[in-house]
Amino acid sequence: MRKFLVVLYTAFLIGANAAAADVAALREGDMKKLALHETPVPVPEVVLLNAQDGEHSLADYRGKWVVLNFWATWCAPCRREMPSLDRLQAALPDIAVVPVATGRNAVPGIERFYAEAEVQLLPVLRDPKSELARGMGVMGLPVTVILNPEGQEVGRLIGDAEWDSDSAKAILTALAAGQ
């Protein structure tokens, strides 16, 4: 029985690594910066605030794949990246694109940023004390993290990217399909 379990576990690992390799092979352009984890990483539970100071958390998105983006209104690369995140949300509505303004970002500034960038589909969420960012080891901005439906980190991209690129959409679609 033990030998059977070892063989079964080994086959599972080979299959899991092959699936990860298939997804990794889809990385082109900016997506080459995407680091995929071999083992999912737990994410801390932290209260996030919306524009009206209502409380939310990443648990609100359990059961869905999440593209979690850490950004700030003063961040120039974030300004370039945000419209592509909005277009990604339009292209892949079954995946939650969740931008979190980390640090001191006033709601009027966020709303002005969204208006200037023509962001229409993304929620306004804030991490005013940078608790989530610190808990996840975010040192600079922007940082985008991919969460599986269990709320665990499975990938991370440091810096800005074109999230509505064919490569990004192919990677996210493959992950969501269970590859």
State each model region's role.
Residues 19-45:
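N-proximal helix/coil linker or "cap" segments that precede and/or mark the start of modular domains
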Residues 56-79:
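Short active-site neighborhood of thiol/selenol oxidoreductases, capturing the structured segment around
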Residues 66-68, 98-100, 145:
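Conserved hydrophobic packing residues within short motifs/helices of P-loop NTPase cores
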Residues 79-117, 128-134:
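Structural microenvironment flanking redox-active thiols in thiol-disulfide oxidoreductases
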